[in-house]
């Protein structure tokens, strides 16, 4: 069976993903802010590095899969937090564990949404991040 790491594995889509993978007999490392096998705050550089370091220590032989599901919605009220977690958290973990995925020819799935456009950000900023502004101007 495979070895999978899931960010945001204690809630929502991430929790269901962990449940299904375990049911199939895979080893799953749940990465979450409070209740994970690896606990870390992916909004911070330190938290991201902790995840990368711990995954390398736990499975230097590689990962079969990485699922990036950790995210916050516009309801959190902080554009900085949304971008720090939903974008930079995911990108940093992908880049930092890419070598582990390569070792086992593993796959990476990044879960995303259009939360940035839900009344929390200026629409010109949201359009830039969504790459829509070039078509409109």
Where on the chain are the PLM-derived regions?
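A hydrophobic alpha-helix adjacent to the NAD(P)-binding/active-site core of NAD(P)-dependent oxidoreductases
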Residues: 37, 82-83
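Conserved Rossmann-fold cofactor-binding substructure of NAD(P)-dependent oxidoreductases
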Residues: 43-61
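N-terminal Rossmann NAD(P)H-binding glycine-rich loop of SDR-like oxidoreductase domains
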Residues: 7-10, 14-19
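Conserved hydrophobic beta-strands of the Rossmann-like cofactor-binding core
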Residues: 3-6, 66-67
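Hydrophobic positions on the long internal alpha-helix
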Residues: 67, 93-101
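Catalytic loop of short-chain dehydrogenase/reductase
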Residues: 72-76, 80, 104-137
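Rossmann-fold cofactor-recognition segment
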Residues: 33-47
């Amino acid at each position: 069976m495979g070895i999978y790491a899931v960010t945001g594995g204690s809630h929502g889509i991430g929790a269901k993903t962990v449940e299904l993978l375990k049911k199939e007999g895979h080893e799953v490392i749940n990465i979450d802010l409070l209740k994970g096998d690896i606990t870390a705050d992916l909004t911070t550089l330190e938290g991201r590095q902790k995840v990368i370091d711990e995954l390398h220590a736990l499975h230097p032989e590689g990962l079969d899969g990485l699922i990036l599901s950790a995210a916050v919605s516009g309801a959190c009220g902080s554009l900085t937090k949304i971008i720090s977690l939903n974008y930079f958290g995911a990108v940093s973990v992908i880049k930092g564990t890419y070598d582990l995925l390569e070792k086992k020819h593993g796959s990476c799935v990044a879960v995303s949404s259009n939360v940035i456009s839900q009344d929390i950000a200026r629409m010109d900023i949201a359009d830039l991040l969504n790459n829509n502004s070039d078509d409109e101007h």
